Amino acid sequence: MPPPPHIKPENVLKRAQELIAVGQAPAALNVLHEHVTSKRTRSTPIVSLEPVMLLFVELCVDLRKGKAAKDGLYQYKNIAQNTNVGTIEVVLKKFIELAEKKVTEAQAKADEIQSSLESAAPSSNVEDLEAIETPETILLATVSGEQSRDRTDRAVVTPWLKFLWETYRTVLEILKNNARLEVMYQTTALQAFQFCLKYTRKTEFRRLCELLRNHVQNAAKYSAQMHAINLSDPDTLQRHLDTRFQQLNVAVELELWQEAFRSIEDIHTLLSLSKRPAKNVMMANYYEKLARIFLVSENYLFHAAAWNRYYNLLRQSAAALAAGQGTKKENPSVTDADMTKAASFVLLSALSIPVISTSRSRGALVDVDEVRKNKNTRLTNLLGMAQAPSRAVLFRDALNKGLLKRARPEIRDLYNILEVDFHPLSICKKITPILKQIGADPEMEKYVLPLQQVILTRLFQQLSQVYESVELKFIYELAQFPEPFQVTPAMIEKFIMNGCKKGDLAIRVDHISGVLTFDTDIFSSAKALHPGSAAGSAESEAGSVQRLQNTPAEIARLQLTRLAKTLHVTCMYVDPSYSEVRIQAKQAAQARAAAGVAKEHEETLARRVIIDKKKEAATDALQRKQREEETRKRIRTQQLQEAEKQRLLDEQREREKKRIKDEQDRIRQQELKKQLEELKSGVKGIDISELDLEDLDANRLRAIKLAQLEKEKNELNDKIRTTAKRIDHLERAFRREELKHIAEDYEAQKQHDMEVYEATKAETLKEAKEKHAEAVALKHRLSRLVPVYSNFRKEVSEKRHEEFEKRRKAAERDFEAKKKQRIREVQERRRRERAEREAEEQRQKEEEERARREEEERVAREEERRRVLTEEKAKREEERKKLDEIALKQKQREEEAEARRAARKAGVTEPPPRAAEPERTAPRLNIAPRTGGSSWRERQAAKEAAGGAAPAAAPAPEAPKEEAQPPRRTGGGYVPPHLRSGAGASAAPAAPPATEKYVPRHMRDSSSSQPPSRTQTPPAPAAEKPEGSGAPQKWVPRWKQQQS
């Protein structure tokens, strides 16, 4: 079953318009409200729902139904924020425009009612729009019949002002924390600020600021939601900064200084989040408003610091504009007059800072000081300063920047009188004209009172250094200021009491004798006895104010210090070793410091490296955590978006199916109705009342219609056949009757045609004669102009011919000139190209010549290097040969000496043979280095010579085999003693070559794979090495020996 018709937006809109037309606007609003807040509306297309919302907000404004409008707009935002954001902005703008229009109309109506009354601030007596009626106003309205302007505004204008305020608040609540509606949100906030400023709504402005502040605080809480704002985005942050600066401006205009200070804190918080620096024009407005706030709160120290920052910003802007590094849009326009004014205010505000302390009283608690310290830290951060400002620092900064030259003359004179050349007896006379000039300026008049406090403080501090007591009358005469800034005795006494209470002054007043006594007790407060010790005092710096003499308290307090200094100087003069010991101790300390500098530097560098690594690790961990969080957030957001997209697709698909089905049903119903109407009007003979309309469909209707049409066709054919037969008989009768009159008709027609021909012929001849006569007359009339025409034509032709010849000759001259110019250009181009080509060829030749020279030089250097290497190699070979010869001679001398020793031993005693116990042959120690070797041909020849001479050279003694001589070592170097003892029994063998290497035992014993034991007789040397033992042998692996 299809839904009821009033569910469709078009039907709802039509129904509401009908109700409005009959004067039932509340009923129309109820209908629209029910439709907008219905769940079925979520699937309605936005295009068809927008007109309904426009009419809905219009009725809400007319009837002042703010709550209903809020409900409907919330529902509409939820429906349209994912598909079409523009329609939300259109509806909300319409809502605000209608509310503002109603307020304007209400004001006009109130003006008409009370045309004789004028008010600069409408409804100024209504402090709170949400609490309009108070018991006093109700009683006044009851007992008083007078119609005043306030009562008229309260009755006519104030309700619409309240509704407009609720409109702004509702729109801001709807648009909050939505990135797609952020621009509209900021625009609405600016409109709300203008509303508060235009109608002087201070209470609503406070609530608006708190509302915006809560929205920003909740932005981080709802950052995971879809379309949440991101304060890390530079554009978003810049829009919030613009809104907060406008909030600051409105707060200052309304003189709501507390809200202005909170706006300053909001701006500072947003600036700390910003990655890009703020514009200079915005920061100039920031410091200017901050200076006004500090002046109102009588915080003159930070007021002067704000002026100092403002002046620095103006200097930077002027320098940037002069250097062309900035634009006028980003930097405030600065003139010399602006710089002079700013410099004057910087200096004047610094002079107005109280000299004595205003921070605490003498008995203040520590927690109070801590709170004030925290407050000063906050204010310092707001100014963007590294440390808290002070009076001395501000003056030093002003002097370094040359503010005295830029300031106005009276301000410069005031600085010289107060800070440079202060004289208590003539201070008031000197400063009177300056105070008059300052008091004449409305902007500088606010500094007169703090300047009086500074002057009185300096006056009493200077008098306390000179006098012990003075008359009150003398004080009153010194403290004389010009009118209207005159200081009364009561004000002076109040100032003295406040200074004594805070511990800055130590003064007693005796009203009986009229004397003012300065306290000289040496045990009194050090703060009172040391002028200028207060924070921010100009006298805290040495030499800022002339000190006349020390007070008794200072003399008593500094007695030990003076004694220590005197004793130190005396020791230096009396005992020279005292200075030497100090110098030595100083040098020792310096030496220790120098010795530990490197180590401390290395430790510092190591700590810095460790700290950097820890910072990098912490940063990496934080970045990784942030990336993971961003990834999770992105995945979650993507999942939500995909789920929302899928839900919207499903809803869209269902709506489309439903729409198609409804459209098909509607078309089917319309088709049935149309066919029924056609049956009623077109086809006769059908009684529709007998048909069941519920059971009808298109096919049955079509069959009924076709049957009826067939029936009508048959009836029509019968009628046509009967009519044709009747017409045939009539036509035959008509033709028989016509045959009688055909001849007569022919003659009459021919006579008529001849008459028409004669008339046409006569008319044609007449027209031809008239035309011929006119042409002949025209010819005779124009024949007189032919000679004149011919002459004129001839003259024009000759002039044209002469002009043509001139132009042709000029063209030929131009052509020849351009041709010659072109020839010169071509020749010059070819000459230039030829010169460039020759220069290029010359450059290539020079390049090739340079490359060839470089190659030759490289080859020469290579040849020289090879020659030097060859010479060095030859020198090394010669040195090696010399060393080999020296080693060989040394070895020969050692062998000869060994042979001589062996011969001497053999001549003295001959040891018995040791055949039974052969000595163990130890491996040869390769002590003698290999110095020079022979080639493989020489070694081969030596082997062959040794093999042939072995049988002949060996003696043939008859000895048993078991008593064969022990094997001799074939290598040179160290010879064991048992081998030396047997040298006398036989001839000494030839010295082995010095180049023979160490040979292992298992390779020396070639006859057996087992090493010789102690009970076996070692084989003879000839049997061990048949090829001679003089040549070096090559090492052969074990596996290869076994294979052989």
Curated annotation (Swiss-Prot):
This is Eukaryotic translation initiation factor 3 subunit A. Residues 797-1044 are annotated as: Disordered. Its main location: cytoplasm. One of its GO terms (biological process) is formation of cytoplasmic translation initiation complex. It comes from Aspergillus clavatus (strain ATCC 1007 / CBS 513.65 / DSM 816 / NCTC 3887 / NRRL 1 / QM 1276 / 107). GO terms for cellular component: cytoplasmic stress granule; eukaryotic 43S preinitiation complex; eukaryotic 48S preinitiation complex; eukaryotic translation initiation factor 3 complex, eIF3e; eukaryotic translation initiation factor 3 complex, eIF3m; multi-eIF complex. One of its GO terms (molecular function) is mRNA binding. It comes from the Eukaryota. InterPro entries: EIF3A (IPR027512), eIF3a_PCI_TPR-like (IPR054711), PCI_dom (IPR000717). RNA-binding component of the eukaryotic translation initiation factor 3 (eIF-3) complex, which is involved in protein synthesis of a specialized repertoire of mRNAs and, together with other initiation factors, stimulates binding of mRNA and methionyl-tRNAi to the 40S ribosome. The eIF-3 complex specifically targets and initiates translation of a subset of mRNAs involved in cell proliferation. Component of the eukaryotic translation initiation factor 3 (eIF-3) complex. Residues 339-523 form the PCI domain. Residues 797-901 have a biased composition (Basic and acidic residues). Belongs to the eIF-3 subunit A family. Keywords: Coiled coil, Cytoplasm, Initiation factor, Protein biosynthesis, RNA-binding. Residues 92-121, 611-907 form a coiled coil. The keyword Transferase does not apply. Gene3D superfamilies: 1.25.40.860, UVR domain. It is found in: Cytoplasm. Residues 943-956, 1006-1017 have a biased composition (Low complexity).
